[in-house]
């Protein structure tokens, strides 16, 4: 057996909630530079935005983007928006991942045999619910990642300053900008990510190809990351463009998507695909492996406290 052993007692909702948020924060710490590179590539080609990321630098590929940012803005630029990112994951992942099993059981009325439809419903529900909780943190994270030091001063000096500036200049709605595409994106991402992970893991275990250990979690998470990137990239690009846009630049997320299609063609919807895949693939592996181990460790700790002898 690799890692912590599974306990006879299933993890509680609280353990899943805390475990999911913590695991997502660990995954974000490791993969954040890839996410920043993805954002820069996705907004490249925009004419205007509240944060001008591409005014003095053109980005080519994942490593090219990272190296250009390090050269022109310094290594710390790769972690722009990290605080907001961790705030987002602690509130966001706790809901969309931590509550997934509980919502799935609600839809299946406690049955152990969940259909694909029930899993999709659960993924859509927790994904959309998470946006309602964490949207402002996502807006601030994207704005920080998009802003460049080269060619001018930084618009936001700190995370708190970013929240205040956006609320003052754009109103309360500014903090909830892009909610519609984000709800769509996260319903899709959650379904692709959690349901694919669920199905791959179940298939591997039922076929006796693997046991419920780290290799199984790694394989399932990697497959889920690839499927999620393919399905969610178009919505993710629109979400990023719309949240980073200047006030009045786009009338809606749909207008943003139509403008992209007309000016840049359909390939624009897959801008930043490679960093998206590298980020989502690695993020999924780190998050799911850590999450599975955290659940077991926390339940083992709870069990040992209840029965010390």
Swiss-Prot record:
Alphabetized Pfam families for the sequence: Mito_carr
Start and stop residues of the Solcar repeats: 11-106, 114-203, 212-297
Superkingdom, natural source: Eukaryota
Mitochondrial intermembrane side: 1-16, 104-119, 200-217, 295-309
Annotated site, Important for inhibition by GDP, chain positions: 141, 185
Membrane topology classification: Multi-pass membrane protein
Mitochondrial matrix topological domain: 41-77, 146-173, 243-268
Main localisation: mitochondrion
GO cellular component: mitochondrial inner membrane
Keywords: Membrane, Mitochondrion, Mitochondrion inner membrane, Repeat, Transmembrane, Transmembrane helix, Transport
Function: Antiporter that exports dicarboxylate intermediates of the Krebs cycle in exchange for phosphate plus a proton across the inner membrane of mitochondria, a process driven by mitochondrial motive force with an overall impact on glycolysis, glutaminolysis and glutathione-dependent redox balance. Continuous export of oxaloacetate and related four-carbon dicarboxylates from mitochondrial matrix into the cytosol negatively regulates the oxidation of acetyl-CoA substrates via the Krebs cycle lowering the ATP/ADP ratio and reactive oxygen species (ROS) production.
Complexes and interactors: Homotetramer. Adopts an asymmetrical dimer of dimers functional form. Interacts with MICU1 (when methylated); leading to decrease the calcium sensitivity of MICU1.
Protein name in the entry: Dicarboxylate carrier UCP2
Species in which this protein is naturally found: Pongo abelii
């Amino acid at each position: 057996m690799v890692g912590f052993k599974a306990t006879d007692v299933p993890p509680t909702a609280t353990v899943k909630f805390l475990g999911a948020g913590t695991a997502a924060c660990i995954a974000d710490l490791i993969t954040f530079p890839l996410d920043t590179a993805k954002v820069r590539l996705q907004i490249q080609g925009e004419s205007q935005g509240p944060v001008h990321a591409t005014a003095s630098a053109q980005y080519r590929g994942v490593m090219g983007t990272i190296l250009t940012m390090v050269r022109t803005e310094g290594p710390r630029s790769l972690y722009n928006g990290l605080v907001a990112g961790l705030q987002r994951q602690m509130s966001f992942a706790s809901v969309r991942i931590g509550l997934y099993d509980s919502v799935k059981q609600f839809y299946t009325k406690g049955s152990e045999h969940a259909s694909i439809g029930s899993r999709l419903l659960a993924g859509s529900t927790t994904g959309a619910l998470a946006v309602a909780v964490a949207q402002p943190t996502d807006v601030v994270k994207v704005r920080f990642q998009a802003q460049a030091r080269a060619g001018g001063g930084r618009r936001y000096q700190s995370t708190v300053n970013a929240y205040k500036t956006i609320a003052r200049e754009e109103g309360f709605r500014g903090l909830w900008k892009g909610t519609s595409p984000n709800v769509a994106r996260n319903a899709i991402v959650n379904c692709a990510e959690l349901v694919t992970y669920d199905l791959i893991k179940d298939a591997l275990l039922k076929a006796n190809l693997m046991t419920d250990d780290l290799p199984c979690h790694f394989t399932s998470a990697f497959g889920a990351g690839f499927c999620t990137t393919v399905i969610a990239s178009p919505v993710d690009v629109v979400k990023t463009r719309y949240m980073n846009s200047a006030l009045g630049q786009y009338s809606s997320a749909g207008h943003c998507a139509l403008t992209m299609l007309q000016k840049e063609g359909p390939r624009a919807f897959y801008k930043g695909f490679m960093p998206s895949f590298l980020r989502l693939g690695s993020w999924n592996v780190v998050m799911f492996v850590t999450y599975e181990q955290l659940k077991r460790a926390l339940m083992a700790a709870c069990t040992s406290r209840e029965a010390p002898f």
